[in-house]
C-alpha cells in the first residue's frame, strides 16, 4: 500500500514529516517529496507550493513518478458553511473550481471544458476518514463540497459572489481542485481533508495568521488516524 499526502505549505506538512520512519527527501522542479513509512504504510509526503499551478505540476510529478494507490490533500482552508468555526475539519464529498467560467459555451460554472464540473472524492477514503474521526476529541468534523481558486478569500464581495454560485459550499482554499483534476486524469482515488484557519470574508487574513498552526495540527491528527486504517 502506497499513500501520498499533499500539503501546500511547510506548516501543513511539518508534523507528518516528523512522524515518518526512515524519511528521505528529494527536490524535483522546486517540489519537495519526502518518502518514508508510518504504521507500516508507505507514505510519500509532498509539499506542493501554494496555488493551482503549483499543485497541478507537483501532483503530476507525484503520480507519474511515485504511483501512489491513494492521495490525501490536507492543510488549511477558509470556512464557508454557516455551521462551521475556526479549527473545524471538512472532509470533501466533491471538489470544484470556483474561479473558472466558460458558461458562455454551456458548461457549468466552475467546469473546465472536457472535464467534470465536480471531482468526486473516493467513497472508501471518505468512509475511512469518517471512522478515523472517532479517535479525535473536541474537533468538529463536517462533510461537503470544497471549492478552489487562486485568490485568498478575504474580500466580502468575492465571498458573496462565490456563495451565489455554490449553494452548499463548506470550504474554500487554493489547491484541492487542481489536485483532484490531476487525480481524475490519472484515475487515482483521492480525498481532501482541510481544517479551518479562518472564516471566509471575516477578517480572514488576520485569522489565517493566528490559527494556521492550529488548523495544521487538527488536519494532521486526522490524516495520521486515516493512515493507521488504510491497510
From Swiss-Prot:
Cellular component, GO annotation: cytosol
EC code: 3.2.2.9
Protein name, UniProt field: 5'-methylthioadenosine/S-adenosylhomocysteine nucleosidase
HAMAP family: Salvage_MtnN
Gene this protein is translated from: mtnN
Cited Gene3D superfamilies: Nucleoside phosphorylase domain
Residue stretches in coiled coil: none
Reaction(s) catalysed by this chain's protein: S-adenosyl-L-homocysteine + H2O = S-(5-deoxy-D-ribos-5-yl)-L-homocysteine + adenine; S-methyl-5'-thioadenosine + H2O = 5-(methylsulfanyl)-D-ribose + adenine; 5'-deoxyadenosine + H2O = 5-deoxy-D-ribose + adenine
UniProt keyword annotations, A-Z: Amino-acid biosynthesis, Hydrolase, Methionine biosynthesis
Keyword Amino-acid biosynthesis: yes
Domain of life: Bacteria
CDD domains, per the entry: MTAN (cd09008)
GO annotation, biological process: L-methionine salvage from methylthioadenosine; L-methionine salvage from S-adenosylmethionine; nucleoside catabolic process
Family: Belongs to the PNP/UDP phosphorylase family. MtnN subfamily.
Gene Ontology molecular function, alphabetical: adenosylhomocysteine nucleosidase activity; methylthioadenosine nucleosidase activity
Amino-acid positions noted as binding substrate in the UniProt annotation, renumbered to this chain: 78, 153, 174-175
Any Pfam family matching the protein: PNP_UDP_1
Amino acid at each position: 500500500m502506497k499513500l501520498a499526502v499533499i500539503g501546500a505549505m511547510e506548516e501543513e506538512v511539518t508534523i507528518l514529516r516528523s512522524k515518518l520512519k526512515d524519511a528521505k527527501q528529494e527536490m524535483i522542479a522546486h517540489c519537495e517529496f519526502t518518502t518514508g513509512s508510518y504504521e507500516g504504510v508507505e507514505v510519500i509526503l509532498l509539499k506542493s507550493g501554494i496555488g493551482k499551478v503549483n499543485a497541478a505540476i507537483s501532483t503530476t510529478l507525484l503520480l507519474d513518478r511515485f504511483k501512489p494507490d491513494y492521495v490525501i490533500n490536507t492543510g488549511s482552508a477558509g470556512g464557508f458553511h454557516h455551521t462551521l468555526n475556526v479549527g473545524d475539519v471538512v472532509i470533501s464529498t466533491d471538489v470544484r473550481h470556483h474561479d473558472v467560467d466558460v458558461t458562455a459555451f454551456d458548461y457549468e460554472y466552475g467546469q473546465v471544458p472536457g472535464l467534470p464540473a465536480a471531482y468526486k472524492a473516493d467513497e472508501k477514503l471518505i468512509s475511512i476518514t469518517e471512522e478515523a474521526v472517532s479517535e479525535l476529541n473536541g474537533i468538529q468534523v463536517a462533510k461537503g463540497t470544497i471549492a478552489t481558486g487562486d485568490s485568498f478569500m478575504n474580500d466580502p464581495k468575492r465571498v458573496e459572489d462565490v456563495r451565489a454560485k455554490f449553494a452548499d459550499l463548506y470550504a474554500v482554499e487554493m489547491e484541492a481542485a487542481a489536485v483532484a483534476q490531476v487525480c481524475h486524469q490519472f484515475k487515482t482515488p483521492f480525498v481532501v481533508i482541510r481544517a479551518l484557519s479562518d472564516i471566509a470574508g471575516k477578517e480572514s487574513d488576520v485569522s489565517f495568521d493566528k490559527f494556521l498552526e492550529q488548523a495544521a495540527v487538527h488536519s494532521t491528527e486526522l490524516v495520521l488516524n486515516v493512515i493507521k486504517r488504510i491497510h
